[in-house]
A protein has these predicted regions:
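Non-heme Fe(II)/2-oxoglutarate
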Residues: 1-78
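Catalytic core of non-heme Fe(II) oxygenases with the double-stranded beta-helix
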Residues: 53-174
Length: 174
């Protein structure tokens, strides 16, 4: 995903909005990163170096092409029936930003499978930790794709960034 890396490297603070939790509420104690959607909507502007709706679609498709085979393998291995995959969103975590313990499936956002595609690894902190399954934080590398069930059995968090800026793309399947 070199294209996404070069875009975020060139414009690291432009166009991201505060990330929300349930019902579009802001709570920086629970989730303090910023986000922008790769969903091509009518309000598109020049954000993060993406000058047009077509460029947004192209970047989303590029991420899809680089992650689809792994998703198909996961679905087959664990027997999920997927009817929809959401467009990818890019997340940016700056120093001290984090997300606390949570499951990705819940009202008003029902989903079955969560995907996180890591775009860089030139930061410190920001490890992913699963409460009951791994027990130790996981430090992803650029290009890693983490796929897991969105259920309460996979409660997880992102530890605070201690230096640098972390970029990841996320998507959910229903």
């Amino acid at each position: 995903i070199r294209q996404a890396e070069s875009i975020t490297d060139k414009y690291p603070t432009t166009g991201f909005k505060r990330a929300t939790i349930n019902n579009h509420q802001y709570d920086t104690n629970l989730r303090s990163c910023t986000v922008f959607s790769l969903f091509p909507d009518k309000s598109d502007r020049s954000i993060v170096g993406i000058e047009s709706r077509a460029e947004k679609v192209k970047l989303n498709q590029r991420i899809v092409s680089q992650t689809s085979l792994a998703l198909i393998d996961f679905i087959r291995e664990y027997g999920f029936t997927i009817t929809e995959r959401e467009h990818w969103e890019l997340l940016s975590y700056e120093e001290t930003q984090k997300s606390t313990w949570h499951a990705d499936n819940g009202a008003p956002h029902p989903c079955l499978v969560s995907m996180v595609y890591y775009l860089n690894d030139d930061y410190e902190g920001g490890e992913v930790e699963f409460k009951d399954h791994i027990g130790t934080p996981f430090k992803p590398s650029a290009g890693d794709l983490l796929i897991f069930p969105s259920s309460v059995d996979y409660v997880h968090r992102v530890l605070p960034i201690t230096s640098g800026r972390k970029y990841a793309a996320i998507s959910f399947c229903k």
